[in-house]
């Protein structure tokens, strides 16, 4: 039976994880969490933590990690659907009836995963081959280590419009197009979407390749081509619900207690190359509500670290405006301001990873950033100017849905 991600998310939200785990494991309150000796390995000092707000447990000793469903399958040995049915009964939810169309969609998604996996293997092989000298030179100039290149799965898409079609001949044209690998234009022959680009795989939370991003290698030869090109939305990929590098950054964030949001995937890789592994990026769009919720499942106060130019600061303000209506107790954003004109890679190369760590250690609050951005937006030379500032701040405050947080922001800002 195929259950939708939305239904499963609702089940997790209605389930109090500590109550489920507490039936078979003695839990002790530890701040906002509960702790216990881990049931998955022998230990005397508790390193197993349960977080009801985020809906997961994690052991810092053996790395066991999961939600209520995973607990019932791993700790009690229940089959997946039996675990779901037990939790649904307790939550007062009805398990959806089997849907043949859902099964067909699941089968199609599995087939499309085969397409993206095959494409990724081909891209990586191209980078290592004779045609990969130009992208290899670019990666060398960027200072990416061989280990980073392998870990992040860099590849190369050649300029030939039919190269991928020939290489992935086991898949028909329809599947290649549905996976976002080919472009179909009425009255013309289909052609490869990614050509003469340095390629990066985009993964889902389980680490499966679901889409790609490509950086153009010869922008002067094609001035109209975008510098970066992502896969379109497909049955596998919804860019507004996906964060680049989340499957790698989430374990690192659990260790460090922080999650960093940068503008693009090359920024996330540059941070990882410098040893800062808990960085993610949206995919060509402003940070969405769904992405903010994804971040809050990992940490309570993700750190925005956008470029230190006007575009980067505007992107930060768009993210803040998107987050304000969603604010709730213990959930907010923090903001790091990079030096003017610099992105994370520039700062690391100029001043070293230590300079980046120093900035990340002292981020500004959302409230302070909001005040300073609006304060600098226009001069305050007259009573009218000051009234305009107050009106802009009040508009922001009024968008906050949580009454207590709205009242506190109003008191601080006005």
Located regions from the model:
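Phosphate-handling DNA/RNA-contact segment within nucleic-acid enzymes
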Residues: 3, 30, 104-119, 158-298, ...
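Conserved active-site segments centered on acidic
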Residues: 6, 82-137
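C-terminal or mid-to-C-terminal helical accessory/interaction module adjacent to the motor/catalytic core
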Residues: 330-413
